[in-house]
Amino acid sequence: MSFLLRPSSRTVIRFRPALHLASLGLLSTLCLTLPAHATAASDSQQALAQLEERASQASPREQCFLYAQIVHAMTEQAGQQIADGDTEQAAATLQQVNRYARLIHLNLAHNAKRLKDAEELIHNTTYRLAECLHLVSGPDKATVQDTLKQLDQVNDELLTQVFAH
């Protein structure tokens, strides 16, 4: 029975090239995914810039939803920056989130289009930012709390507008 437990020398030799190929495949996969992370960040920056451009040129009725999309994307970006430990960049991103939240507030008076979609997006964004609140401390926590307060206010205003129409 011990012959069943011991692999024969033929078996080991036969699988050795497969191990090398598997190792090579794993190594090449790792090497290819590292630049993909940098490319993904660059792509998301480009998409965000395009969204900002589209929002700046959109009609006042459409801007509310586009700004909500920008706030959502920037909050996700800030969450990733917080998770990566880049709190200074996250604080700058959250300042931009505050700016766009104020723009949403100002555009509500223009009979905004897709109010319910914008409200749902801001609600999800607020929830995500509340999760990020537990990852920061000190002065960074105050920045996140201020942004969260601003988004809560915008969400309440959006809800009021949704139920008014």
Show where each model-derived region lies.
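Long, charged/polar, soluble alpha-helical segments
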Residues: 38-165
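Bacterial N-terminal signal peptides
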Residues: 18-33
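N-terminal secretory signal peptides that target proteins for export/translocation
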Residues: 1-16
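N-terminal targeting/docking segments
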Residues: 11-15, 34, 108
